[in-house]
């Protein structure tokens, strides 16, 4: 894992740790995913999704779920723009 990807994994885990205090798991996942979608550069988002697709080493459970959701939304959006 490159140092850049390690940094992204750490940031995703830190963000999910913050949202882990939500009483509902779905809210924690949504909060993490929304934060990444709003505040991360598109290149960073593509890198973390690619890392997840390669196995997602180091991603915590909430961060992994958030990146999976982000990847699903990105796939839906690109499918909509190409049709």
Question: How would you name each of these model-derived features?
Answer:
Residues 9-12, 33, 67:
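Generic structural concept
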Residues 5, 56-59, 67:
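Generic N-terminal initiation segments characterized by hydrophobic and/or small/turn-forming residues
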Residues 16-62:
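Amphipathic, hydrophobic secondary-structure cores in small proteins
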Residues 6, 80-83:
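Surface/interface-facing alpha-helical segments and adjacent flexible terminal/loop regions used
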């Amino acid at each position: 894992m490159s140092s850049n990807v390690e940094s992204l994994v750490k940031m995703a885990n830190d963000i999910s740790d913050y949202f882990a205090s939500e009483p509902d798991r779905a809210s924690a996942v949504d909060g993490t995913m929304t934060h990444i979608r709003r505040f991360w550069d598109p290149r960073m988002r593509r890198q973390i999704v690619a890392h997840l697709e390669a196995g997602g080493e180091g991603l915590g459970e909430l961060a992994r779920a958030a990146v999976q959701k982000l990847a699903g939304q990105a796939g839906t959006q690109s499918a909509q723009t190409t049709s």
